[in-house]
Amino acid sequence: MKVSIIGATGYGGLELIRLLHQHSSVDIATLHSFSAQAETLATFYPHLKDLAVSPLEKINPTEIIEKSDTVFIATPSGIAKDIALPYVDAGLNVIDLSGDFRLKDRQLYEKWYGKSAAPTEYIGKAEYGLAEFREKKETTFIANPGCYATATLLGLAPLATNKLIDPTSIIVDAKSGISGAGKVPSASTHFTETNENMTLYKMNSHQHIPEIMQQLTKWDESIPAIQFSTSLIPITRGIFTTIYVKPKNPITQKELHKLYESTYDNAPFVRIQPENVYPTVKQVTASNYCDIGLAYNEKTNVITIVSVIDNLVKGAAGQAIQNLNIMANFAESDGLRFIPVYP
């Protein structure tokens, strides 16, 4: 299969290149950038010398359609809604890593992203690509989930799909490494601001909130809202999500573990930790794994769920490739069989 990557110079695009380089059934046909053409990626990223030798090209839909079977769009939100349409119309596999097609309600997108929304027709064609819970595996147009949404939804899914949560009790405390802010530097991501520091940002206003709610209410329509906070922590990669919920009825620790283990029994990239063991960000670094730890406090009737992912892999490029594997009927783990980098 031939693929093109639009937005190849960003962190998401770079991860797609790294992972697809190991894929047994995929060849990268073309790489595209808005900011640089004619240069090779190695010009900007020396670690890719002799690996990414094709020049970066401007975006030419006719050429991309002619040369590729699949298009990955790894651009900031607000771009894919305009550039993805020709590839969808041509019947190519299209996987968008931005937020442009995730929300089915155009008004919600415009409220939370502050940009004009994609045409209704195309929003309707896109399937939300939470890989472990995809319903239409033959779909060729995927809205890849956000990093916070992936960690949160995988953490809540076993309880939410079985309608076991007290619907007003969900509290999510999510923390992200600096790469989650993207490649373009800013004052808030400057080393002197982030080193030895932790910053709360977008309190009650993060754009992944409606995305999470859209999926949660699909599983359990009684959930009215979530309390969701996001923080920036001084690590390069990783999402560390701590979720607190109350079950509708008391549950034992063993019942809780059994529920999660049975839900993810056939999910190659979700690993449930043993009882009283909680995951760290480092144990999933540079991998497509989501590791989940669980605890139940009988005194307070509170379940604590710890869900960790690499924001650039399971939270972006890795899940995008996992979605490609599902739609193309490849082995789900092809191109993703990476042992996490440690230490």
From Swiss-Prot:
GO terms for biological process: L-arginine biosynthetic process. SUPFAM superfamilies: Glyceraldehyde-3-phosphate dehydrogenase-like, C-terminal domain, NAD(P)-binding Rossmann-fold domains. InterPro entries: AGPR_AS (IPR023013), AGPR_type-1 (IPR000706), NAD(P)-bd_dom_sf (IPR036291), NAGSA_dehydrogenase (IPR050085), Semialdehyde_DH_NAD-bd (IPR000534). The active site is at residue 147. It comes from the Bacteria. Its main location: cytoplasm. GO terms for molecular function: N-acetyl-gamma-glutamyl-phosphate reductase activity; NAD binding; NADP+ binding. Keywords: Amino-acid biosynthesis, Arginine biosynthesis, Cytoplasm, NADP, Oxidoreductase. Pathway: Amino-acid biosynthesis; L-arginine biosynthesis; N(2)-acetyl-L-ornithine from L-glutamate: step 3/4. This is N-acetyl-gamma-glutamyl-phosphate reductase. It comes from Listeria monocytogenes serovar 1/2a (strain ATCC BAA-679 / EGD-e). The gene is argC.
